[in-house]
């Protein structure tokens, strides 16, 4: 959600993640933490005669990079959904072409959220299978 703010600030986002992770680690020291990146979305603009137009939200890629960097610097796990679903070039296009986004171009239809959950599930199962086979 941070990337939907047009005043998105990398440092603020990084520090907010740090506060949350430290709070979780202090409260639940033996629990693993998995960070995820956002799936991609659009932002809307008003055109003449109150017509809306949509463009890929450029801050999503920045927020995803911030999450990946934070995870790397703090030795946390991260599942990069943004990359899995197409990254900067295709994430939004893929969701739109599959007709899995709501008309606001930010939120997803139930089928879109189900797909996101299934992708995460498959990633976890694949990682576990790799772990037990090595």
Specify the residue positions occupied by each region the protein language model found.
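Oxyanion-hole/transition-state-stabilizing segment in secreted/luminal serine hydrolases
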Residues: 1-12
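Amphipathic, non-transmembrane alpha-helical secondary structure
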Residues: 11-18, 22, 118, 122-125
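Functionally constrained cores in energy, signaling, and assembly domains
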Residues: 13, 24, 36, 87, ...
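Conserved, well-ordered alpha-helix/loop/beta-strand core segments that scaffold catalytic motifs
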Residues: 17-21, 25, 32-37, 41, ...
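Surface-exposed acidic, glycine-flexible loop patches that form ligand/cofactor-binding
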Residues: 25-27, 130
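Loop/turn elements at helix/coil->beta-strand transitions in domains of secreted/extracellular proteins
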Residues: 28-33, 73-77
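Catalytic His-Asp segment of secreted/periplasmic serine-dependent ester chemistry enzymes
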Residues: 41-134
């Amino acid at each position: 959600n941070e990337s939907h703010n047009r005043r998105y600030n990398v440092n603020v986002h990084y520090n907010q993640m740090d506060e949350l992770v430290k709070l979780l680690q202090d409260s639940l020291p033996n629990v693993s933490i998995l960070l995820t990146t956002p799936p991609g979305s659009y932002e809307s603009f008003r055109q003449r005669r109150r017509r809306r137009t949509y463009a890929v939200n450029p801050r999503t890629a920045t927020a995803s990079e911030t999450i990946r960097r934070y995870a790397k610097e703090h030795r946390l796990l991260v599942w990069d959904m943004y990359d899995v679903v197409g990254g900067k070039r295709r994430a939004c296009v893929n969701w739109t072409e599959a007709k899995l986004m709501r008309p606001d171009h930010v939120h997803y239809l139930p089928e879109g959220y189900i797909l996101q959950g299934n992708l995460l599930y498959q990633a976890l199962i694949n990682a576990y299978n790799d772990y037990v086979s090595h």
